[in-house]
Amino acid sequence: ESAPDPGPVHVHGLGVDPADETLYIASHTGLFRLPRESSAATRVADRYQDTMAFTVTGAGRFLGSGHPDMREDLPPFLGLIESTDAGESWVEVSLQGEVDFHLLAASGSRVYGFGSVWGSNEAVFFASNNGGESWTKHGPPESLIGLAISPSDPRMLIASSARSLFLTQDGGKTWNRSPGSPGLLAWPQPDRLYLADSKGSIERSTNMGQSWRQAGRLPGPPSALGFGSGELFAATHNGAVLESRDQGATWSERFSP
């Protein structure tokens, strides 16, 4: 008799597929789908891939990174991987065996990633303008825990370390310290940038992170922040997924482990 499915453990990423507004939950124990009107998360493709970084780039199109399912003959660092069938299958784009991306952000053909390099203690910020096929390395300002790309300018990103926020307007070549407390980031609209700090406070900025106001509060510390179709999504450390339909002011449980 097989062991029960553990469900999503240690949620790293949340994203909505614009094809059908299904929420995808990327976790240490695999990728799960949560249809719009459902509270039951189902494992995608019976795969236990540790999806460390995850972002939705289009209808059924995802980028990811992390570590393979133990049953697959793949190196421990997946590099950049892509799915064009909503997570049913993944193919290597680049850097397999070389890089473990912890954070990914993409807009059009521009892809950015922060992660660790195999065989070194080095953490690197990578930028690509051809969908991740080739990369330029930039030194990140500090080790990063959050990354979001502007919906209106693919060269503008805001990043968070454990201590500070940073803004780049040239695709990661240069970074300037930005006001605000550190945290996880989501940037659904040019004038709506969200941050979830380590205590669960939700902050909102309407001016690209130059100033912040508290919008609401999560019931606990967040492990992931995401958005889709007018909603914000957050995962807490116990594995619950919450959603807000009023710009972060109030939150309701969407999935409970």
Q: What are the roles of these predicted feature ranges?
A:
Residues 3-32, 52-53:
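Beta-strand-rich domains and repeat architectures in extracellular enzymes and scaffolds
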Residues 10, 50, 100-102, 143, ...:
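Beta-rich catalytic cores
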Residues 14, 54, 104, 147, ...:
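Hydrophobic core register within WD40 beta-propeller blades
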Residues 19-21, 59-60, 108-109, 154-155, ...:
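Short coil/turn segments that connect the beta-strands within blades of beta-propeller domains
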Residues 29-44, 77-94, 126-139, 166-177, ...:
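Asp-box/BNR beta-propeller loop motif
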Residues 30-32, 67-73, 117-121, 165, ...:
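Short glycine/acidic-enriched loop and turn motifs that connect beta-strands
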Residues 41-78:
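Blade-loop segments of beta-propeller domains
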Residues 71-77, 116-123, 160, 197-198:
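Short, solvent-exposed loop/turn segments at conserved positions within beta-propeller repeat blades
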